[in-house]
Regions:
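Structure-specific nucleic-acid interaction/processing domains
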Residues: 1-110
Length: 110
């Protein structure tokens, strides 16, 4: 397993960013120094909420979706959802994924 870290940043104006890195200290410094993602350049980091070691490449999207569920899709970026402005198709996909993840529907056919 790769030594990937997932990090969650609290940003200005109630925004959040989820990222992944093999070099957490270096990458976090980039965000805090204005050299990070477009989202963290627009909304400056306030604090590191979580740093999660021993993750895999898929965990970034998982944590991004979890944060979107908690804080709203307009307030969180990360993983496959890094664009400053999400298009309608992307918003539809995110909402569908969130509904599917929280659905209590039985899977009787399986």
């Amino acid at each position: 397993m790769e030594d990937i870290h997932i990090y969650i940043l609290q940003l200005e104006k109630g925004k959040y960013y989820v990222g992944k890195t093999k070099e957490p200290e270096f990458r976090l410094n980039e965000h805090f120094n204005g050299d990070g993602s477009e989202w963290t350049r627009k909304f400056k980091p306030v604090s590191v909420l979580k740093l999660i070691p021993h993750c895999n490449a898929y965990d970034e999207d998982k944590y991004t979706l979890m944060m979107m569920e908690q804080h709203g899709i307009f307030n969180v970026r990360g993983g496959s959802f890094c664009e400053l402005k999400l298009d309608d198709r992307c918003k539809f996909t995110i909402n569908k994924m969130l509904r599917g993840a929280t659905s209590s529907t039985k899977l009787d056919n399986f």
